[in-house]
Amino acid sequence: MNRVKCDRCLVGAPVIFLCTVHERRTWGRKQEAEEMSEKKVVFFDIDGTLWNWHNEIPESTIRAIRSLRQNGHRAFLCSGRSRAYIQNPDLFAIGFDGVVSGCGTMIEYGGETIFYKKLDVDLVEHTVNTVRKYGMRPILEGREYLYMDEREFAKDNYGKKLKAEIGPRLLTIADEWGRWEISKISCATETADREKCYEELKDCFDFIIHDIPVTEFVPKGYHKGTGIAKVCEMLDTDIKDTIAFGDSANDIGMFRVVGIGVAMGNSSEDVKLEADYVTTPVMEDGIWKACKHLELI
């Protein structure tokens, strides 16, 4: 295989806008802007923020989000998970106006997909081969499917968790070779030569390195904050009227762009340092308490 030049891949990778000028004008019409002038757009991370690591959502969190929407504020899911990995009906039963997924690489509003960043297939192939060369185990993440080779995760509980949670949406990298449609990649990195891998792929991706041995490979220039900025542009909303709740490294990007960043009490210290306000942990009514403090409810 010829080595792929990253600048070619980045320029050539398709960015899909699925909203019309008319729709954008509709969302941003003057009357609505006046009505929303004192209202906020609130973005919620999922893991460690809306629910704990057992997928348990506090009743107070559900009440808080429903109450803030009743008060005229908008609520969005904003996750590093790709859309294929956001399927739990308990999440959507809470009620959200839209979804920012895949670290800003996909945006939905009102049940419609309005933005999607698709990675070039040649770049994906090159990246899979490169991360494996350095001892990483990749999971390819798209809007419809995740791709993982089971042999690489046979002794890993995470692989079993994925299979249990998304079932038929989990496909095999090898079986779908060259037919992937994805927007980001995550890699297990326990025994990997990480620095050499990052150096080789640094022109193509930004890396979100977690405390657990996992790294997210996100298209250069994309993160949750860029997704939020696109939402604000499409809604004709001032970004200072945004609030974000999060707990992990991939939430720092959104804390740096929103009006107010709220770190959960269970956040890592580096995340708390980036936040404007630190609430209690997810299972100690953290979202409810912060929403009360910020006068959203």
Q: Can you say where each PLM-predicted feature lies in the sequence?
A:
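Mg2+-dependent phosphoryl-transfer enzymes with acidic/Ser/Thr/Gly-rich catalytic loops
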Residues: 37-41, 58, 216-297
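Active-site phosphate-binding/coordination module
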Residues: 54-154
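Short active-site oxyanion
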Residues: 72-76, 95-97, 183-185, 240-242, ...
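Asp-based phosphoryl-transfer active-site loop
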Residues: 40-54
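Conserved acidic, metal-coordinating active-site core of Asp-based
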Residues: 14, 130, 134-245, 249-254, ...
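N-terminal amphipathic/hydrophobic targeting modules at extreme N-termini
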Residues: 2-20
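Short, structured coil segments at secondary-structure junctions
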Residues: 92-95, 102-103, 200-204, 257-258, ...
